[in-house]
Regions:
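Eukaryotic scaffold/interaction segments
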Residues: 1-636
């Protein structure tokens, strides 16, 4: 018979023939006497010579002769007396508590009805961490008592199954007509009231304390017999307190959860004293697994949810900020040392509790902001040193920001499992410190300029250029003043294009395409126009030289002209006209005449401030080639 026998448990029934219809051959008193003797034989496991048909007929005839009350009450009293005798013989001798201990334990657990529990029950019962040496010796006695209870329970269930078969007619006719409990349910209630909740002996107190001590000792590292605990659990689940609750949920579970809460409150205090977050979380993780395994092995599955909430609240929820701020293994330390496995454990555990990720993200956000401010302050100190070029500062600042972003992205992906709330915290902090640097738009533009300028080590490596531009865009997204960035970018692009320093047209267009994705067509319209002007200028210049060759005209110098659309370029009109040297004037006039034939009505305005000239100068025996501005050419 299973120890966790539920009510109305399906059992194998003996085949019974219908009783023969005949008059009473024996008196009512004799029938009851024989039936009572048969029940006694069943209770003593001496059934080899019993006739189920005969005794079924006795019960049948007693019901027909209106003796159902006498029969039902007699069976109830006989079962009760048997349970009292069995309890005195089998349980009382193996009580694990003395009379004084039982009285003290009962007082400690008083008030447990309806969930109203003392907040110091575990302390009164000696069930707090550190008391293992005192309770480990009680394990064998507790095991003997619990085993005796389950053995008596198994014996009772076996007897009740056979008694129910004999009294099947009682269940079929008498019970529903008189609103009595079925024989099986009667037996369970009698076991509950006569044994488990006996008012004669402190069986309930011994049972609860033994169960609690076994669990406590296992928590402290001892090995206990889980099968026995499981058997007691099944028994208590089979016994009903009322229509909604079992004895397990009414008597055992509240006191178990209450003492568990006290235990882990004390355990958390002990672990916090170590000031080692990694050790704390490893211990918490181990405790969670132990409690899960214990429920799976020997407690009710319904206990898991409230138990889990208690352990998580005591070990995590109530100490989130303390764990995060620990000097050894706190989140800041883990981030600084890039301890991703430990951060993954922290994230995984903090995610279990409602406010865990909020607390973690608060520290994460502050960490990223603080590290970003350090980057900004370092750059600010460099900017005060006039010997540090802006481009060098920009490269340093953007590289540090990119390195920080890359490291945090790695932490987000591996340790925080791509959690959206963690990602939002990182992005918010990045946004904050990047925009605290008022030169961020300029630095990002300079960084891009350094990679797109011809002759730099970055522009020469075309395979590595695209990933760099992609990473730069991730920083650009955080910039609030994108109009400021556009102004700097146009200025740097102008220099690259007009001074023939752009690495390639494809690279320029790729970068502008990325900006278009981020900010839309209107944002890059003028930038695209600048590139188109340069392409059209090449075509116009080729046509100009071809015309000169065809006409056999030669110029006093080689002239290269870029025709720019004024609205696209960051160019101011010259305030005063410039006086070019005669040779330059002749070349300019020739170009204007040619351009007018192709674009009649358009007016060209020369911008000497943007031009350069290659000049060969003879100094005695040495010749020098100079690259000078147009204004310098005019002076020379």
């Amino acid at each position: 018979m299973s120890t966790g026998a539920p009510r109305r448990l399906g059992v194998r029934h003996h085949k019974l023939r219908a009783p023969r219809k005949h008059g009473l051959s024996v008196s009512v008193e004799e029938m009851w006497s024989r039936l009572s003797a048969a029940i006694a034989q069943i209770q003593h496991h001496n059934i080899s010579k019993l006739s189920y048909e005969e005794h079924y007929r006795y019960a049948y005839n007693l019901i027909l002769n209106q003796q159902g009350d006498m029969l039902y009450q007699g069976v109830q009293l006989q079962i009760q007396e048997h349970l009292v005798n069995q309890s005195d013989m089998r349980l009382t001798p193996v009580f694990s508590l003395s009379i004084e201990e039982a009285q003290a334990a009962s007082q400690a657990m008083s008030g447990s009805d309806k969930g109203k529990l003392r907040d110091n029950t575990a302390r009164l019962l000696g069930l707090l961490p550190g008391n293992a040496e005192a309770l480990f010796p009680t394990i064998p006695a507790g095991e003997r008592f619990l085993s005796a209870v389950t053995a008596m329970w198994d014996d009772h269930c076996s007897c009740m199954s056979k008694i129910r078969d004999v009294l099947k007619y009682v269940d079929r006719v008498y019970v529903p007509n008189h609103r009595r409990e079925p024989i099986w349910d009667l037996g369970l209630d009698l076991f509950r009231d006569t044994v488990v909740r006996s008012t004669r002996v402190p069986c309930r107190t011994n049972l609860l304390v033994a169960m609690l001590r076994q669990v406590y000792c296992e928590r402290e590292g001892a090995t206990v017999e889980r099968r026995t605990i499981k058997a007691v659990t099944d028994m208590l689940l089979s016994l009903l307190h009322d229509a909604k609750q079992s004895v397990y949920t009414h008597d055992f579970e509240p006191i178990f959860l209450s003492t568990t809460s006290e235990y882990y409150a004390t355990e958390a205090t002990r672990l916090l004293e170590s000031q080692r977050a990694t050790y704390y979380l490893q211990s918490a993780e181990r405790r969670f697994a132990e409690e899960q395994a214990r429920v799976d092995a020997c407690l009710s599955p319904n206990t898991l949810a409230p138990l889990k909430e208690i352990v998580e609240r005591r070990l995590l929820t109530e100490h989130l900020d303390e764990i995060l701020a620990m000097p050894d293994g706190g989140l800041v330390v883990l981030l600084d040392t890039d301890a991703r496995a430990d951060m993954e454990r922290m994230y995984r555990l903090f995610r279990l509790v409602p406010t865990g990720l909020d607390a973690l993200n608060k520290v994460l956000r502050a960490y990223v902001t603080d590290r970003g401010k350090i980057i900004n302050e370092t750059t600010l100190c460099e900017s005060k040193n006039t010997q540090t070029p802006s481009a060098e500062m920009a490269m340093s600042w953007v590289n540090q920001v990119l390195n920080t972003k890359s490291r945090l992205d790695g932490v987000l992906a591996t340790s925080f499992q791509g959690d959206k709330s963690c990602e939002a915290a990182i992005n918010e902090a990045m946004d904050t410190f990047i925009n605290l640097n008022t030169r961020a738009p300029e630095f990002i533009s300079l960084y891009i300029d350094e990679h797109l300028r011809k002759g730099t080590r970055f522009a020469d490596d075309t395979t590595a250029l695209e990933p760099v531009l992609d990473k730069t865009i991730t920083i650009f997204r955080y910039v609030h003043e994108k109009d400021v960035f556009e102004r700097y970018y146009k200025m740097h692009l102008t220099r690259r294009l007009l001074h023939n320093r752009s690495a390639s047209d494809d690279a320029e267009r790729s970068m502008i395409a990325k900006l278009k994705v981020e900010c839309g067509h209107g944002y890059v319209q003028k930038l695209q126009g600048m590139l188109n002007d340069m392409k059209l200028s090449e075509e116009v210049l080729r046509a100009f030289h071809h015309t000169l060759e065809r006409e056999g005209t030669s110029l006093p110098l080689q002239l290269n002209v870029n025709v720019l659309t004024a609205t696209y370029w960051p160019i101011a009109s010259p305030k005063e006209p410039s006086i070019f040297p005669p040779a330059l004037t002749e070349a300019c006039n020739a170009f204007e005449k040619f351009y007018d034939t192709r674009h009649r009505g358009r007016v060209l305005t020369w911008q000497p401030s943007l031009g350069t000239a290659d000049v060969r100068v003879q100094f005695k025996s040495r010749t020098h080639e100079l690259v000078v501005s147009t204004y310098a050419l005019m002076v020379l």
